[in-house]
Amino acid sequence: MNITPFPTLSPATIDAINVIGQWLAQDDFSGEVPYQADCVILAGNAVMPTIDAACKIARDQQIPLLISGGIGHSTTFLYSAIAQHPHYNTIRTTGRAEATILADIAHQFWHIPHEKIWIEDQSTNCGENARFSIALLNQAVERVHTAIVVQDPTMQRRTMATFRRMTGDNPDAPRWLSYPGFVPQLGNNADSVIFINQLQGLWPVERYLSLLTGELPRLRDDSDGYGPRGRDFIVHVDFPAEVIHAWQTLKHDAVLIEAMESRSLR
């Protein structure tokens, strides 16, 4: 896939992007995941390091891996990511739900037994990921007390707010722990913006920026956001001052705005 490099941005804008990116990639752990959980929930996405992180936890802790994802508006990004992967490109994708594709990765490449893979293949958005996953957990023979939720880092904070909205004050609900697998960071090279993380299977830079800039309006708790005072999809989310400041930096960067508009990303 030939993608036009994203033009270099000011150091202040790069810093602002990384502040927001780190905040969105909510990580309840420091470094590796040491906490023994009862289940890992992998929400369908197309970020290979995140997918691998969920599989690694399930394999190492020998716990069930619940994979959630049907066929939605972003499924083709997973198809493309699989096709470009040096190992996973042998997996059939076209016309298949995200969960079934990721289950093949978990079993064939991470050697997770079929009985430890729980598939939810009907959800098409973040809300359904949470609702249908919780319904599947409720059918488990043994109660799940703690679940590690793994999602595309740009959607991690919203996904956690969605799970907490779905379970509310239910005392029997699992303890939801957030883990994005890694935290993306951008930087400038000589003539373009690149990921400092040298990892296989990341988004194109322009796709990452589109997702990142689209998340903050959704997380707001106002008439246009997803919070209780808006569409009521998520619990209230507090925005740190540095994130608000970073968002203002992005909104007033003419180079960023022009580059994204030229790519139809706004």
Swiss-Prot record:
A cellular component term, taken from the record's GO annotations: plasma membrane
InterPro entries with a match to the protein in the record: Cell_Envelope_Assoc, DUF218, Rossmann-like_a/b/a_fold
Pfam families in UniProt: DUF218 (PF02698)
Subunit structure: Monomer.
Family, similarity comment: To S.coelicolor SCO4629.
Function: Binds S-adenosyl-L-methionine (AdoMet).
Name the record gives this protein: Protein YdcF
Species whose genome carries this gene: Escherichia coli (strain K12)
